[in-house]
A protein has these predicted regions:
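N-terminal phosphate/diphosphate-binding loop that engages ATP/GTP or pyrophosphate donors
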Residues: 205-262
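Walker A (P-loop) phosphate-binding motif
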Residues: 182-225, 347-356
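Short internal beta-strands
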Residues: 30-34, 108, 219-221, 249-250, ...
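Phosphate-binding/switch loop-helix module in NTP-utilizing enzymes
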Residues: 259-289
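Phosphate/Mg2+-binding loops and adjacent switch elements
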Residues: 280-346
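Extreme N-terminal, non-catalytic leader segments
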Residues: 172-189, 196, 327-351
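Nucleotide and nucleotide-moiety/phosphate-recognizing core
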Residues: 1-138, 146-160, 169
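Short, charged/polar "capping" segments at the starts of alpha-helices
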Residues: 20, 36-43, 227-229, 301-305, ...
Length: 356
């Protein structure tokens, strides 16, 4: 399947999201460089006022797209951006522009030592060098760039800005983060196919790791048995037994409210009742998880891996097709993934996993 047209959690496709955000950022001209024409590309170009160009030599990868795009450029300098970077911040161009001077042909941002050639500034004449390289059989960006005058610019920014959707597992991550973009406050579901898997312990270990990053959490648990908060015979229990539909207790260190309902309220309903000093809502459930969900697996039952599942944490982790899989005790990675899904910035070592 062509990843450019994969549906994201906000209803857009990966490519249409990039085009919309580029247009909103105020770029005067947008050139959509593609390997060949197809109806979806023509329609997207028309919708966002982009100039659609195609590669002179198909199947040559990004190098051919750069050559074709720069040949059609109307300005001396252009931002070359891959269409699969859903979280790129177009304001980064302001940091690159001062370096676009003199003999420089490419302003190449680097992050944690990684080149970002598909989020770089290129001078128009660099396109000729790409075309010449392709003609002689060179299509690797690294080889071509070494023949140009390149100004490397180390950046200390959120690694998520350069995250690209190169794999089905990365697509799941992107959908989870975009789902949270559309919410007033982000949600993370922790689910497991069977009791005894360790959902509570997993969340208990995750919370302090998030707190180090300043994340204030609330946890909402699904219960299938019914519950009574107070001890039988105590005041609030007696009020409920007498027929009160709700009771509340206020104390110097907090409060709780218990309300009887005729049917289970969904998590969103409960979230709306919690005060706004919370940064992340974690929901614990066996089957009622929302996107994004971290699925836990201890081998007690087969986990249901549907579109809501963003990553799998399992005992004796093994590779899982199209899904990130980690050891059930790898809480540092769980925290990094959670921060990414929240849209929180990740720097240095914390962000490297989202660059590769």
């Amino acid at each position: 399947e062509d990843k450019r047209f994969l549906p994201m959690a906000d209803g857009e496709t990966l490519l249409s999201r990039t085009l919309r955000r580029g247009r909103t950022a105020g770029f005067r001209t947008i050139v959509l460089a593609a390997e060949g024409e197809r109806r979806e590309l023509t329609e997207l170009a028309a919708a966002y006022g982009a100039h659609l160009v195609t590669d002179d030599r198909p199947q040559q990868g990004p190098a051919a797209a750069i050559a074709a795009g720069l040949a059609a450029a109307e300005t001396e300098w252009s931002l070359v951006l891959s269409g699969d970077m859903p979280f790129y911040d177009f304001d980064l161009v302001r940091a690159l522009l001062p370096e676009a001077r003199g003999a420089v042909q490419v302003v190449l941002p680097t992050l944690a030592g990684y080149w970002q050639p598909l989020a770089a500034l290129y001078r128009r004449d660099a396109g000729q060098a790409f075309a010449a390289a392709i003609a002689r059989g060179d299509r690797k960006l690294g080889i071509i760039l070494r023949g140009l005058t390149v100004r490397e610019l180390p950046l200390a920014v959120d690694a998520g800005l350069f995250f690209n959707v190169n794999t089905p597992a990365a697509y799941r991550l992107a959908c989870g983060r975009i789902a949270n973009e559309g919410r007033e406050r982000p949600i993370l579901s922790v689910a497991a196919p069977a009791s005894g898997t360790g959902k509570t312990t997993f969340i208990e270990r995750l919370i302090p790791r998030l707190a180090v990053h300043g994340v204030r959490t609330a946890v909402i648990k699904s219960d299938s048995h019914g519950f009574q908060l107070d001890t039988e015979g105590k005041d609030t229990a007696r009020f409920m037994t007498a027929g009160a539909r709700a009771t509340a207790i206020s104390a110097p260190n907090g409060y709780f409210i218990q309300k009887i309902e005729d049917q289970r309220k969904d998590f969103q309903n409960l979230i709306s009742k919690i005060e706004y000093d919370i940064d992340l809502f974690i929901t614990e459930s066996r089957s009622r998880g929302a996107l994004p969900t971290l699925m836990l697996d201890r081998g007690l039952a087969a986990p249901e891996i549907d579109a809501r599942v963003t990553a799998l944490f399992q005992k004796d982790a093994a590779p899982h097709d199209g899904l990130l899989s980690y050891d059930l005790d790898d809480m540092e990675t769980a925290a990094r993934i959670t921060l990414f899904l929240m849209g929180r910035p990740l720097y240095g070592a914390d962000g490297i996993m989202f660059l590769t």
